[in-house]
Amino acid sequence: MIFVLDVGNTNTVLGVYDGDELKHHWRIETSRSKTEDEYGMMIKALLNHVGLQFSDIRGIIISSVVPPIMFALERMCLKYFHIKPLIVGPGIKTGLDIKYDNPREVGADRIVNAVAGIHLYGSPLIIVDFGTATTYCYINEHKQYMGGAIAPGIMISTEALFARAAKLPRIEIARPDDIIGKNTVSAMQAGILYGYVGQVEGIVSRMKAKSKIPPKVIATGGLAPLIASESDIIDVVDPFLTLTGLKLLYEKNTEKKG
């Protein structure tokens, strides 16, 4: 079995693959202060809960956009799994033709998503990932990673509104009854949700205009189902796109090792 870890700024998503099947997955808070032992005990509990042991795992791959956490995670893998993890970063084989000015600037999460997206859905392709930041990735019909856009995530914007406007409360991100809010909470929900729907439709439409062949639009991340339910511009919601990409990269980089 392969253990995959997608470390984001807010949450870390973990998964266990048995062949091509995602057998188990979990979402935990990303903590920069946890030690290797704390991570080890937490992951041990998650594995044990589904009847697995450290020894059931034969390979590990990690994608992270939080560099300070990597030391603890790498040491945890060595200490508890007795496995040196594969890290998504410089030197890893991706198969991507990256046309960024500096390819090293492309985040690990965006690379992993692109690998999975091309494998599952072909090209051209636009991938929207609703995380701490909302990222847009454009892959052309030649499977070249051309770049994209990065915007503040919906939660960042919501928290900023709460923090900067004294009379506005902290709210849950949810669909309001009407676009015309009748109270402060519903008005904020309408502005946040439909404001983001408008952002997605605007950016994706402009990216689509760059392609002679209509690209498929894939959304992933925690809020993807909510946003997609309010817009026809998203073709597919794939909640496990990043985990799939990690599995594919693990296979690509270990296939000669058996």
From Swiss-Prot:
Pathway: Cofactor biosynthesis; coenzyme A biosynthesis; CoA from (R)-pantothenate: step 1/5. The active site is at D109 (proton acceptor). CDD domains: ASKHA_NBD_PanK-III (cd24015). InterPro entries: ATPase_NBD, Type_III_PanK. K(+) binds at D129. Its main location: cytoplasm. A monovalent cation. Ammonium or potassium. It catalyses: (R)-pantothenate + ATP = (R)-4'-phosphopantothenate + ADP + H(+). ATP binds at D6, V7, G8, N9, T10, N11, T12, V13, T132. The keyword ATP-binding applies. GO terms for molecular function: ATP binding; metal ion binding; pantothenate kinase activity. One of its GO terms (biological process) is coenzyme A biosynthetic process. Its cofactor is NH4(+); K(+). Transmembrane segments: none annotated. Gene3D superfamilies: 3.30.420.40. It is found in: Cytoplasm. Homodimer. Catalyzes the phosphorylation of pantothenate (Pan), the first step in CoA biosynthesis. Belongs to the type III pantothenate kinase family. HAMAP family: Pantothen_kinase_3 (MF_01274). PANTHER family: TYPE III PANTOTHENATE KINASE. This is Type III pantothenate kinase. It comes from Geobacillus kaustophilus (strain HTA426).
